[in-house]
Amino acid sequence: MVQSCSAYGCKNRYDKDKPVSFHKFPLTRPSLCKQWEAAVRRKNFKPTKYSSICSEHFTPDCFKRECNNKLLKENAVPTIFLYIEPHEKKEELEPQEQLPSPSPPTSQVDAAVGLLMPPLQTPDNLSVFCDHNYTVEDTMHQRKRILHLEQQVEKLRKKLKTAQQRCRRQERQLEKLKEVVHFQREKDDASERGYVILPNDYFEIVEVPA
């Protein structure tokens, strides 16, 4: 007799080529056997000596490692089951009445004045129109702000250029002063006496002791 799994909905049958083992109900241990029966959850099911459950309904810790996971531990209980509830008849839903889709607003002619009137603003297209206005206003505000920032940058650039020119002039003046000081030192070192040049109305050079 080919062994098959007694679990509800399980179609596993013994096949030597498949790594599925089958385990008999522990009929000699009534308390443990009742736990197996409760786990199977089959109404009016009474296991016999031929009844068995396949290894797919046991967790790995239920097996003895030294036996290559082929033998169950003494108190192992199957706990992995897929319970399928009986199919209930689905209530047929009445088809919902489809509401006519709103037609887009169209321009109308006013019979009193004979002029083409703009389409009526419904809540939907009104919100779109308002959003569009907000977008345009935001864009204009951003453009003005960018223009203002560009003007400030240009002013700062001009100030920086002026400051750089002033700095270069001061550097040139400093270099000239350094040259004068250097020349004066060389002149003082070369002569043993110092002279003071008086204005031209003195018409002479007064010698001053060094």
Curated annotation (Swiss-Prot):
Q: Which family does it belong to?
A: Belongs to the THAP1 family.
Q: What is its main location?
A: nucleus
Q: Which spans of this chain does the record mark as coiled coil?
A: 140-187
Return the SUPFAM superfamilies for the record: Glucocorticoid receptor-like (DNA-binding domain)
Zinc fingers (THAP-type), as residue ranges, are 5-57
A GO cellular component annotated for this chain's UniProt record is: nucleus
Xref: InterPro entries: THAP1/10, THAP_Znf, THAP_Znf_sf
Job description of the protein: DNA-binding transcription regulator that regulates endothelial cell proliferation and G1/S cell-cycle progression. Specifically binds the 5'-[AT]NTNN[GT]GGCA[AGT]-3' core DNA sequence and acts by modulating expression of pRB-E2F cell-cycle target genes, including RRM1. May also have pro-apoptotic activity by potentiating both serum-withdrawal and TNF-induced apoptosis.
Q: Where in or outside the cell is it found? A: Nucleus, Nucleoplasm; Nucleus, PML body
Motif interval(s): HCFC1-binding motif (HBM): 131-134
- Share what the entry says about its subunit structure, partners included: Interacts with PAWR. Component of a THAP1/THAP3-HCFC1-OGT complex that contains, either THAP1 or THAP3, HCFC1 and OGT. Interacts with OGT. Interacts (via the HBM) with HCFC1 (via the Kelch-repeat domain); the interaction recruits HCFC1 to the RRM1 promoter.
GO MF term list = DNA-binding transcription factor activity; DNA-binding transcription repressor activity, RNA polymerase II-specific; identical protein binding; protein homodimerization activity; RNA polymerase II cis-regulatory region sequence-specific DNA binding; sequence-specific DNA binding; zinc ion binding
Keywords noted in UniProt: Cell cycle, Coiled coil, DNA-binding, Metal-binding, Nucleus, Transcription, Transcription regulation, Zinc, Zinc-finger
Organism of this sequence? Rattus norvegicus (Rat)
Protein name, UniProt field: THAP domain-containing protein 1
Instruction: Quote the gene name from the UniProt entry.
Output: Thap1
Q: What is the lineage of its organism?
A: Eukaryota, Metazoa, Chordata, Craniata, Vertebrata
Signal peptide range equals none
Biological process, per Gene Ontology = DNA-templated transcription; endothelial cell proliferation; negative regulation of transcription by RNA polymerase II; regulation of DNA-templated transcription; regulation of mitotic cell cycle; regulation of transcription by RNA polymerase II
